[in-house]
């Protein structure tokens, strides 16, 4: 199976750059797997597509402002050409860091820019001044002369966060160890920026802190560096309407990490490997899911992150005596890669946004609905000018 099998034509103007004023005013393409029919709807119709007794499963992970701007200490300066913008940033010590996954009490995996010049042993200082300066002149577009650049001593004194590079991963990511602070996430909330995906061609704005977050994201479930975007369409009223229809709602957590930004570099789909992402399923959620499966009720997953969590959890358990899948409560790390040929054990229906060409998320949707069906649906969505990707419209497959 080739990655090119999952390519499709997408005009650039259909990539949503802004969130809609009303979350629930997005469009919804309804795809029936049995009839392969499409129906153009609005998301406000979604509750009517659910059945009494369905179990709707949400990912309640909370996005944090994971993009940090800082300065390096300059302890390991390397000779670089000032003609290159990234090299100029390096000479001035400017660094952009995208935290992707917490791997220890003070340790994080991160993407670093300019990446090739930041070696093990480097120290990076983060302050409010760094953040403001980066928005005025984004990293890798710095002026070749910045006479007001502070020196290393001043940076260290002003820093509210300090990290040392302690490792480098196989995909180019760095491992950072942060010096302890009283409340790490509170400091990141102050200094950080919303990690909008690269296809949103603008800087983040204050309103993105609300709109690039589901209304049901829980404060205690903070840890995602990208939103579980299928959930962005929900409002409290929509959730109330769903409950009134006799639909049960369960929540789990999967912290969206580096895999969201990871392109597929191989030609054969089967050779691709996903990064691990942390997840947790509570005792209450596990009971809800197992009861629905035992009673042969539909499990409706909101988003690909929910699908991966459910199917990974089920893959760790044997079938019940009745031959149904089960999940266990607990925490772990999921690296399940779902593409056509995968046998779904838990999910009966899927709400998902429109995904990038040749992406692992499109492969997951194709595994669930059939590649040809999904590509036909996407061609219809392009023709009808649906909005694509994170701030775009959605599709319900049943």
In which residue ranges do the predicted regions lie?
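Extracellular attachment/recognition segments
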Residues: 142-143
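Surface-exposed, charge/polar-rich loops and edge strands
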Residues: 1-139, 149-398
